[in-house]
């Protein structure tokens, strides 16, 4: 399992013990906190690496699956990140994204567009549209589940059909 944008390792306790995890992040400071969590929880199945998710230092089809939580709308090149995730995941493997995407509801979508400049300065895109993003990468959602009250955050699971 590859976790892209592992940050401080918030998800690490959620993975089953038999699952080998490779976590990457661009931020050394975040990785230091994740490493503390690895040591604290005695997670021998976790490897952490500093890496740009748009140019991953992994071979093609190296992972069974990949996940990115709260990452895709916070990176400068979400298409590049998803392309790389697709490249390193084996055919038939899962690509899971938990993220905020632009709402399909017209009023909410317009509000997200209006606040987008402020959100961008804060480090994330409030109006990132899901469907065009996935189409550019050649992915289609098998599962698309809304995960909060306002339906802006969605759990997307795609099967890598190369």
Regions found by a protein language model. Give the residues of each.
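Short glycine-centered segments of the SAM/dcSAM-binding site in methyltransferase folds
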Residues: 20, 92-94
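C-terminal alpha-helical "lid/dimerization" subdomain adjacent to the S-adenosyl-L-methionine
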Residues: 96-154
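Conserved SAM-binding loop
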Residues: 23, 48, 64-67, 97
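C-terminal lobe and adjacent flexible extensions of AdoMet/dcAdoMet transferase-like proteins
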Residues: 155-162
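Class I SAM-dependent methyltransferase SAM/SAH-binding core
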Residues: 2-55
């Amino acid at each position: 399992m590859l976790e892209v944008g592992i940050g401080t390792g918030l998800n690490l306790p959620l993975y089953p013990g038999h699952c080998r995890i490779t976590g990457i992040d661009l931020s050394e400071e975040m990785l230091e906190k994740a490493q503390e969590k690895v040591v604290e929880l005695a997670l021998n199945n976790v490897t952490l690496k500093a890496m740009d998710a748009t140019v991953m230092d992994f071979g093609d089809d190296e992972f069974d699956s990949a996940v990115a939580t709260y990452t895709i709308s916070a990176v400068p090149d979400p298409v590049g990140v998803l392309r790389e995730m697709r490249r390193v995941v084996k055919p038939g493997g899962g690509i899971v994204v938990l993220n905020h995407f632009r709402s399909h509801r017209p009023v909410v979508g317009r509000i997200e567009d209006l606040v987008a400049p402020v959100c961008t300065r804060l480090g994330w895109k409030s109006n990132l549209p899901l469907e065009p993003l996935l189409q550019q990468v050649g992915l289609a959602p098998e599962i698309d589940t809304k995960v909060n009250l306002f339906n802006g955050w969605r759990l997307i699971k795609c099967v890598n059909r190369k």
